[in-house]
């Protein structure tokens, strides 16, 4: 279905108490307006006209990769005025969908229903029935059909009793919308040009006005302050958690789980409390994710256990691995099958081979580590000389004792042993033992200093 979209995003958002434009505040790790843009793109919008005002530079920087038509509303004179700024770009025969950058949860299904309901010569608008309609424009009907929308400040006492309210979302053809926008005036309590007045204009011309309801009222809730944003965040996360539960993922507490990207899960996956998923994450079968872990843009293969409070970003973890607790895998880290990394181990741009282990207090950066390697506690690959990064290569079946510094570039051959406390600066051949230690001294009769009383 061919259509173009106008997204209104010019508001300052005073009640957010922020220097950032309201629509750039994030929901599930993504700016609110980006949720709306993504929904439009998923539905195949031909053009997206983004009406902006406050914080234009911040807006364009944050959305630099988005294919949108930037439309400036220099003065905020109402929703009708905002849409009118984009009207020169409307094609006469195309459907124009009006959305809002601070209403991030509107669904594709609801938009499709609205587009399908739009009469050829009329308007389709999205309405919702609220127990407390205070603050919303009321839907005025006459023997069934919608004839007008009256804003709260302009409503009579009788009209204020109406519970069906306007969401601001509507669809009309470009030709009609341009004509109706041109006829708007600001003779109202706010002194603004209301988009809602196009409903009365359509009715006066005898055009049909169809009302469509969203699947859930949360879809059309807007954000004016941080309390409302927090409410939508939890609603969004609850919806994501429900989908995962329906797919068979075991969330130990759905209320304490945050998905801020996309998650692909195999069967029998268990996710403990306070886990955060960001970016694109893939999890295989029979995987356990421990409490408080953060996974971002990573791949976890089958039968792997991620113990609590591990942070994995831009990394790949193979089958039957154990990670954590308190492990950090940074971009470029790779664990081959059956590898183990334990508490306070950090890896970046490094590969740990099949069956290899680094269980305690270790940094592995710019390293290639073979199969069956044991990396002792306190081992550091010294990969940076103050100007450039250098690589450490460790062969298969190597034993690296505790508290070693491997000063790159350095290569250790298969089966070699590096004694505890060694500072290694030269390559090691296969099977060699290398030890560098300060001479041990014993001082007989030494006594500790006594504490002063």
Curated annotation (Swiss-Prot):
Cofactor note: Binds 1 Mg(2+) ion per subunit.
GO cellular component: cytoplasm; membrane
Active site location: 360
Record localization: Cytoplasm
GO BP, one annotated term: cell morphogenesis
Residues covered by region (Linker): 227-247
UniProt-annotated binding residues for Mg(2+): 102, 224
Binding site for acetyl-CoA: 377, 383-384, 402, 420, 437
Keywords: Acyltransferase, Cell shape, Cell wall biogenesis/degradation, Cytoplasm, Magnesium, Metal-binding, Multifunctional enzyme, Nucleotidyltransferase, Peptidoglycan synthesis, Repeat, Transferase
Residues that, per the record, bind UDP-N-acetyl-alpha-D-glucosamine: 8-11, 22, 73, 78-79, 100-102, 137, 151, 166, 224, 330, 348, 363, 374
Pathway stated in the Swiss-Prot or TrEMBL entry: Nucleotide-sugar biosynthesis; UDP-N-acetyl-alpha-D-glucosamine biosynthesis; N-acetyl-alpha-D-glucosamine 1-phosphate from alpha-D-glucosamine 6-phosphate (route II): step 2/2; Nucleotide-sugar biosynthesis; UDP-N-acetyl-alpha-D-glucosamine biosynthesis; UDP-N-acetyl-alpha-D-glucosamine from N-acetyl-alpha-D-glucosamine 1-phosphate: step 1/1; Bacterial outer membrane biogenesis; LPS lipid A biosynthesis
GO MF: glucosamine-1-phosphate N-acetyltransferase activity; magnesium ion binding; UDP-N-acetylglucosamine diphosphorylase activity
NCBIfam families: glmU, PRK09451.1
PANTHER family associated with the record: BIFUNCTIONAL PROTEIN GLMU (PTHR43584:SF3), NUCLEOTIDYL TRANSFERASE (PTHR43584)
Protein name (Swiss-Prot/TrEMBL): Bifunctional protein GlmU
């Amino acid at each position: 279905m061919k259509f173009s979209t106008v997204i209104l995003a010019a508001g300052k958002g005073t009640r957010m108490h922020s220097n950032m434009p309201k629509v750039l505040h994030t929901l599930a790790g993504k700016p609110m307006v980006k949720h709306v843009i993504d929904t439009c793109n998923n539905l195949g919008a031909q053009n997206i006209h983004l009406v902006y005002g406050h914080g234009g530079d911040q807006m364009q920087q944050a959305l630099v990769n988005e294919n949108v038509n930037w439309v400036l509303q220099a003065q905020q004179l109402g929703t009708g005025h905002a849409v009118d700024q984009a009207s020169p770009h409307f094609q006469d025969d195309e459907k124009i969908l009006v959305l809002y950058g601070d209403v991030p949860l509107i669904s594709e299904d609801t938009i499709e229903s609205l587009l399908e309901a739009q009469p050829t010569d009329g308007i389709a608008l999205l309405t919702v029935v609220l127990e407390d309609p205070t603050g919303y424009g009321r839907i005025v009907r006459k023997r069934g059909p919608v004839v007008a929308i009256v804003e709260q400040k302009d409503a009579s006492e009788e009209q204020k009793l109406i519970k069906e309210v306007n969401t601001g979302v509507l669809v009309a053809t470009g030709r009609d919308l341009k004509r109706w926008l041109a006829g708007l005036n600001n003779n109202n309590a706010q002194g603004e040009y209301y988009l809602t007045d196009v409903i009365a204009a359509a009715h006066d011309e005898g055009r049909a006005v169809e009302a469509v309801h969203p699947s859930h009222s949360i879809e059309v809730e807007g954000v004016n302050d941080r309390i409302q944003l927090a409410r939508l965040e939890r609603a969004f996360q609850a919806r994501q958690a429900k989908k995962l539960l329906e797919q068979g993922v075991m969330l130990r507490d759905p209320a304490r789980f945050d998905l801020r990207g996309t998650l692909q899960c195999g069967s029998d996956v268990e996710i403990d409390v306070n886990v955060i998923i960001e970016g694109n994450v893939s999890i295989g079968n029979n995987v356990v994710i421990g409490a408080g872990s953060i996974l971002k843009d990573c791949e976890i293969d089958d039968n792997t256990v991620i113990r609590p409070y591990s942070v994995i970003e831009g990394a790949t973890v193979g089958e039957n691995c154990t990670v954590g607790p308190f492990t950090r895998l940074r971009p470029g880290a790779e664990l081959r099958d059956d590898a183990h990394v334990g508490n306070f181990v950090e890896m970046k741009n490094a590969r740990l081979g099949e069956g290899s282990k680094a269980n305690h207090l270790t940094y592995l950066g710019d390293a290639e580590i073979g199969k069956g390697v044991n990396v002792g506690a306190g081992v550091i690959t010294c990969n940076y000389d103050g100007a450039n990064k250098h690589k450490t290569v460790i062969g298969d079946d190597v034993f690296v004792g505790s508290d070693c510094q491997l000063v790159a570039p350095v290569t250790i051959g298969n089966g070699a042993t590096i004694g505890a406390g060694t500072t290694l600066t030269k390559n090691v051949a296969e099977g060699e033992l290398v030890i560098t230690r300060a001479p041990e001294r014993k001082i007989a009769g030494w006594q500790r200093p006594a504490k002063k009383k």
